[in-house]
């Protein structure tokens, strides 16, 4: 949904006039840029997303128009990164967030970063609208690499993945294979371990002898008050599982 909210909030666009955009109309107007609109903003995107998807399904909005909005927003993002990149003083990366999730709000988000100065990048990013399965993202990155476009995916907030970020099965419930491991490692060889929304290092349930295992824990699935399953959600445990697999060869 890259660029969609900004377009829907702008008077004079087809998005603005669509009934599905009512929640975000004028949300960025000067009179609304204050803390009193925080409650509205926290609710606006979810409603806009659901209503807009329904409008696409019912053909009340043109999916081609939405695609053109995303392409323009992506071009603006690339231009901003290029404009502000000042090596040695301020480094920018051309990238975006792939926001996949499980049906129960388990977080499967990745930051996707492209190598270089933007001379060779895709015309539009791969999103959950293309596929909600990370395997689809990695296969897309492989295809880009064949065209000379190098990229890197960085999983983040695995702590909120409900056990799916480092599950011992793929997205379709199949056992992990050598081909799966190679596909994943080719495209996301690193992982974020900590950030403001909690650490993804370990959990007291997984590291019972580590007195620091409860440091900066955010135990919920992202944007919910539902507990996230620890097993399969933390990096240290994932590393141990990987070592077991390697030793079992």
Specify the residue positions occupied by each region the protein language model found.
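Extended, charged catalytic domains and RNA/DNA-binding interfaces, predominantly
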Residues: 1-249
């Amino acid at each position: 949904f890259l660029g969609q909210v900004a377009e829907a909030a702008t008077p004079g666009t087809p998005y603005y006039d669509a009934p599905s955009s009512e929640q975000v109309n004028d949300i960025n107007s000067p009179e609304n840029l204050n803390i009193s609109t925080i409650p509205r903003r926290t609710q606006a995107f979810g409603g806009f997303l659901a209503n807009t998807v329904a409008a696409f399904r019912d053909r009340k909005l043109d999916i081609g128009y939405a695609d053109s909005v995303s392409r323009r927003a992506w071009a603006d993002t690339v231009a901003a990164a290029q404009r502000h990149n000042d090596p040695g003083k301020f480094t920018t990366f051309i990238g975006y967030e792939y926001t996949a999730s499980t049906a129960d709000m388990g977080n499967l988000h990745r930051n996707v970063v492209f190598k270089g100065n933007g001379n060779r990048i895709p015309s539009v990013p791969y999103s959950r609208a293309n596929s909600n399965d990370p395997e689809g993202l990695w296969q897309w990155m492989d295809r880009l690499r064949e065209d000379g476009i190098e990229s890197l995916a960085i999983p983040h907030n695995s702590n909120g993945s409900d056990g799916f970020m480092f599950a011992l099965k793929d997205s379709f419930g199949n056992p992990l294979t050598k081909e799966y491991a190679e596909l994943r490692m080719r495209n996301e060889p690193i992982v974020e371990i900590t950030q403001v929304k909690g650490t993804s290092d370990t959990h007291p349930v997984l590291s019972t002898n580590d007195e620091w295992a409860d440091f900066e824990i955010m135990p919920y699935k992202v944007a919910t008050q539902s507990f996230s399953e620890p097993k399969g959600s933390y990096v240290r445990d994932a590393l141990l599982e990987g070592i077991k697999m390697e030793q079992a060869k």
